[in-house]
Amino acid sequence: MLCFNDFNFPKEWEVVPNSFKYIDIVIKEIIGFGLIKENDQELKMIVNQAISIAAYFWPYANEEQMVMGGSVLCWCVLFDDPLDTNKLDEKKGLEIVSRTEKLLLTRTLPNNPTNLEKYGFTIFEKCLKYCGTNTHMYDMLIKLTVQWIYSIIPFNKLNESPVHPETLKYIRKINIGIEFTQSIFYIINSNNKVDLIVLANPLYQKLVDLSSLNISFVNDAASFCKEIKDGGSDNNLFIILMKRLGGIEFIKEAYKQLTDLSNGYIDEFCYYEKLLLSSLSKQQQNEIQIFIDHLKYLMKGNQIWSTKTIRYATEDHPIIQLRNSTNKLIENNINMDKVSLTNKNYI
């Protein structure tokens, strides 16, 4: 039996989640764009579960900001899903990424736009309008969104051969989407005065990288059963560590390696936070502290959300906090006795 609390995020990083009212508004949006049907209760619930994490990411945002952030996350989920699960062939996937990049960079819809492209165009234009004259924050959002969409297909290619943990960690820093998520927070706070030189500081980037890795470690542990069932275990660090140790019988040892790595990065985060703040003026410290705190909310909030959502829940999950026998919507159950992680035949 494994314990999720072995990921030892400081208690003071925990905050009460925001209201979930934005979810119904966002779902009505995507129904209006023809992305899901009004009577498709199952798909509506899946979207609900996916974007509910925004309440943990932005605990102090107002309703307008939550709808804006929730809409961008929803677009992210709808864009990522067919690419992330290899539902499309490579050529079609690359075409979608290229079309989306052009849409974002030129702020122009392509010929014969899809409903998802229309939705993406609309919500990103809302983000730009919200920024007012502080368009530099919008520029950062676009830059990091393009960076993220180009990481999806390479990340999936890790399934094609055994991957070294360091290779996975390098790609995962981008693919996990935390820098992209942080850029949504830049939009939310675009009316606050911020010295962009501070956000360009390499010590701040180090904090973003450490946050990205920590969230990816938590996600890999939480999604263990889901990844085994869906065949995505070749790019899951938790499972890779198990395979390198010799198989499923080494699950406890692999989990300790993963949590030790995470906790070491938490210590590094605290160290580099102090180092960064000590190098700044008092005004710069005040400007950047809100963004550093947000990274903490992302890390701790993601851990808490993982125990609340049915996205990863299953009655036989090896992590006790993620066991849920009432999850009937998303089928993640696997037979642990039939799991083999010594080769490609996982089940």
From Swiss-Prot:
InterPro entries membership: Isoprenoid_synthase_dom_sf, Terpene_cyclase-like_2
Enzyme class: lyase
Listed Gene3D superfamilies: Farnesyl Diphosphate Synthase
Metal-binding recorded as keyword: yes
Chemical reaction(s) catalysed: (2E,6E,10E)-geranylgeranyl diphosphate = beta-pinacene + diphosphate; (2E,6E)-farnesyl diphosphate = (E)-beta-farnesene + diphosphate; (2E,6E)-farnesyl diphosphate = (3E,6E)-alpha-farnesene + diphosphate; (2E,6E)-farnesyl diphosphate = (1S,2S,4R)-beta-elemene + diphosphate
Pfam families assigned to the protein according to its UniProt record, in alphabetical order: Terpene_syn_C_2
Inducing or repressing factors: Expression is almost undetectable in vegetatively growing cells and increases during development induced by starvation. Expression starts to decrease during culmination (from 18 to 24 hours after induction).
Spans through the membrane: none
The keyword Nucleus is assigned to this record: no
SUPFAM superfamilies: Terpenoid synthases
Superkingdom per UniProt: Eukaryota
UniProt motif (NDxxSxxxD/E motif) ranges: 219-227
Gene Ontology BP term (one): terpene biosynthetic process
Short motif DDxx(x)D/E motif, span: 80-85
Keywords, alphabetical: Lyase, Metal-binding
GO terms of molecular function: beta-pinacene synthase activity; metal ion binding; terpene synthase activity
EC number: 4.2.3.-, 4.2.3.200, 4.2.3.46, 4.2.3.47
Domain comment, as recorded: Contains several highly conserved motifs that are important for catalytic activity including the aspartate-rich 'DDxx(x)D/E' motif and the 'NDxxSxxxD/E' motif, both of which are involved in complexing metal ions to coordinate the binding of the isoprenyl diphosphate substrate in the active site.
General function of this protein: Terpene synthase that converts its substrate geranylgeranyl diphosphate (GGPP) into the diterpene beta-pinacene. Is also able to convert farnesyl diphosphate (FPP) into the sesquiterpene (E)-beta-farnesene as well as (E,E)-alpha-farnesene and beta-elemene as minor products.
Similarity comment: Belongs to the terpene synthase family.
Record's protein name: Beta-pinacene synthase
Organism whose genome encodes this protein: Dictyostelium discoideum
Gene name in the database record: TPS5
